[in-house]
């Protein structure tokens, strides 16, 4: 009798533990990255795509309206002035990739300069064939610097919440420090807190 009662107790404990313990995401499926999906009130992939699309179109329109050679651009350090984590590098990469693929822009990799300088030293050390060795003096010089910043405000009253983002991009002429192009994208999202019942 005691053995049966002990077995029942253990079985009940295991069942309750399985029901009440933490649950893991064990099944998933691929979705369309262009579909809008808002799971919470944070910056998400859809917001990034809206900003990128606006900036890409605006920059291409600016270049098309000017009789200038293919501009050479470097990127500023991205600035996130919101209270949440936003992957600004992912946003920059999204914009940069589309502009390069358009064939209208040339981007220089400022982040690789130190590694390239070290590679120059190695290739000039005698280990590399002279006719293939690369060295300083042939790098392109950027004419423009592209920068971006995202700010946000949050308003909450009762169960209602409004989140507002403003993304601003600009191009600065390195020779003159003149801001030659700028544009903004504003995003407002509304949320309502749902009560959780049992």
Model feature map: region roles:
Residues 50-54, 58-128, 176-182:
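N-terminal segment of the mature soluble domain
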Residues 149-153:
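Generic short beta-strand segments
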Residues 1-19:
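Sec-dependent bacterial lipoprotein signal peptides
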Residues 128-136:
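A short, acidic, amphipathic alpha-helical segment used as a generic capping/interface helix at domain edges
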Residues 19-70, 136-143, 154-198:
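C-terminal/domain-edge helix-coil "capping" segments
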Residues 4, 40-44, 80:
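Residue-level detector of alpha-helix boundaries and kinks
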């Amino acid at each position: 009798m005691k053995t049966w009662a002990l077995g029942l107790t253990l079985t009940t404990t295991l069942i309750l533990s399985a029901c009440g313990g933490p649950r893991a995401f064990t099944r998933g499926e691929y979705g369309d990255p262009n579909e809008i999906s808002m799971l919470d009130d944070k910056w998400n992939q859809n917001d990034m795509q809206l900003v990128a699309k606006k900036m890409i179109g605006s920059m291409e329109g600016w270049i098309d309206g000017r009789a200038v050679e293919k501009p050479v651009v470097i990127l500023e350090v991205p600035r996130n002035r919101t209270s949440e984590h936003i992957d600004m590098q992912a946003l920059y990469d999204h914009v940069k990739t589309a502009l390069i693929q358009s064939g209208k822009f040339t981007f220089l990799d400022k982040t690789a300069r130190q590694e390239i300088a070290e590679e120059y030293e190695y290739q000039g050390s005698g280990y590399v064939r002279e006719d293939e060795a690369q060295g300083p003096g042939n790098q392109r010089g950027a004419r423009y610097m592209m920068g971006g910043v995202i700010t946000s405000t949050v308003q909450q009253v009762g169960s209602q919440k409004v989140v507002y983002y403003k993304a601003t991009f600009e191009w600065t002429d390195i020779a003159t420090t003149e801001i030659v192009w700028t544009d903004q994208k504003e995003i407002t999202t509304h949320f309502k807190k749902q009560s959780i019942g049992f």
